[in-house]
UniProtKB/Swiss-Prot annotation:
It comes from the Bacteria. Belongs to the CrgA family. It comes from Corynebacterium glutamicum (strain ATCC 13032 / DSM 20300 / JCM 1318 / BCRC 11384 / CCUG 27702 / LMG 3730 / NBRC 12168 / NCIMB 10025 / NRRL B-2784 / 534). Keywords: Cell cycle, Cell division, Cell membrane, Membrane, Transmembrane, Transmembrane helix. One of its GO terms (cellular component) is plasma membrane. This is Cell division protein CrgA. The lineage of its organism: Bacteria, Bacillati, Actinomycetota, Actinomycetes, Mycobacteriales. The keyword Endoplasmic reticulum does not apply. It is found in: Cell membrane. It is a multi-pass membrane protein. Its main location: membrane. Residues 1-25 are annotated as: Disordered. Residues 9-22 have a biased composition (Polar residues). The chain crosses the membrane at residues 38-58, 67-87. GO terms for biological process: cell division.
Length: 90
């Protein structure tokens, strides 16, 4: 019977220690600072509050009435900033 082909992996020496073949990776366990989380959630909550206040009493508040439809851009913009900050949260 013909002999099967020998692959590269079969001829490579096998280490008795499986962790010897791995490259050590340094893990930063510090996480995100507290101020980052506070600002991130503050952006999202202030944006939501802006939209709710605009919907409920926007025409009665002079500067919000002057902004008109820009209130939606401000509210959603603040929430999007908070959402984008979640990508840096560890």
């Amino acid at each position: 019977m013909p002999k099967a082909r020998v692959t590269k992996n079969e001829t490579a020496p096998v280490s008795s220690n499986p962790s010897a073949n791995r490259t050590p990776v340094k893990i930063n366990s510090a996480g995100t600072p507290m101020w980052y989380k506070v600002i991130m959630f503050a952006f999202m909550i202030v944006g939501l509050a802006w939209l709710i206040i605009n919907y409920l009493v926007g025409p009665q508040i002079p500067f919000m009435a002057d902004l008109g439809a820009w209130n939606y851009g401000i509210g959603f913009g603040l929430m999007i900033i908070g959402l984008l900050m979640t990508m840096g949260w560890r």
